[in-house]
Amino acid sequence: MNENLDLGNLSTIPIAPEGFKSGFVGIIGRPNVGKSTLMNQLIGQKIAITSPVSQTTRNRLQGILTTDKAQIIFVDTPGIHKPHHTLGKIIVKNAKTAINSVDIILLVVDSSVKSGGGDRYIIDLLKTVNQPVILGLNKSDQQTEKYQEIDESYANLIQDHNWPMIKFSALTGDGVETLQNTLIEQLEPGPYYYPPDLITDQPERFIMAELIREQILQLTRQEVPHSVAVTIEKVEESPKITKIFAAINVERSSQKGIIIGQKGNMLKAIGTTAREQIQKLIAGEVFLKLFVKVEPQWRQSNLRLAEFGYRVEE
């Protein structure tokens, strides 16, 4: 398996040379503005799942970028929105906690559309922070001939703040290097927090479960995705193949039927694509067995939320 995804032996952390910079950057914004896509682009490997469905990210996920001059720990936070259930409240609380625990805040917005109330709400939250803030205008590849009008709408939002504004496309990578260099300029001198070859603080099992959930988000109907939690029940490793047994937990029997599909075709499609993604992750052959379980109202149960890995960050 790819050891770069585990914390490994922290004794491998080197002493930082003179002038080396490091720090934590919180990536925040409304749901579905491309925060996770940006994280993957910055790190150079897929560690955060993406989908057209809003509120895809549920847990805080740290991605680690190490260069010769700096180490940046990116904290990909869930989209800040008005919550409608216990899980939603935990998600938003964790995102707000992240704002207060990082060295730099990267506020990502969707520059293919004008600024809106959700952006103003987040900027109001940031009025009292002491950390530097950078406004990132994502989706520059989707801008139309009205881009100047759109850019101006965001510039007006931050006219009372001395925040740099950088345009980029997390999807194509255009402008991301400029963003990275700006972040490094804002960092203070500091140590290595993690070994240089580490790219995330999350264990492989977490990433595996997320890759399975991503395919559910991509392939099932709108009413199913937010009711799904994936848990890795067992992993059996051998020199030739890694066997993974995972449970897909839903709230209603009707959702179980949708996940399984006619003659099991949907579950097969989810498993096939997820297996391909996991094979890329661990650089080896994978056997993936999926089960579907009904856990009524798990999003409202603190016990079930804890069992499925969702907790309030302190």
UniProtKB/Swiss-Prot annotation:
Region (G2) spans which residues? 55-59
G1: annotated span: 29-36
Q: Where is this region: G4?
A: 138-141
Bridged cysteine pairs (disulfide):
none
One GO biological process term: ribosomal small subunit assembly
Which parts of the sequence belong to the Era-type G domain? 21-189
Q: Where in the cell is it found?
A: Cytoplasm; Cell inner membrane
The record's GO CC annotations read: cytosol; plasma membrane
Q: Which UniProt keywords apply?
A: Cell inner membrane, Cell membrane, Cytoplasm, GTP-binding, Membrane, Nucleotide-binding, Ribosome biogenesis, RNA-binding, rRNA-binding
UniProt-listed CDD domains: Era, KH-II_Era
Stated family: Belongs to the TRAFAC class TrmE-Era-EngA-EngB-Septin-like GTPase superfamily. Era GTPase family.
Name the NCBIfam families on file: era, PRK00089.1, small_GTP
Q: How is this protein named in the record?
A: GTPase Era
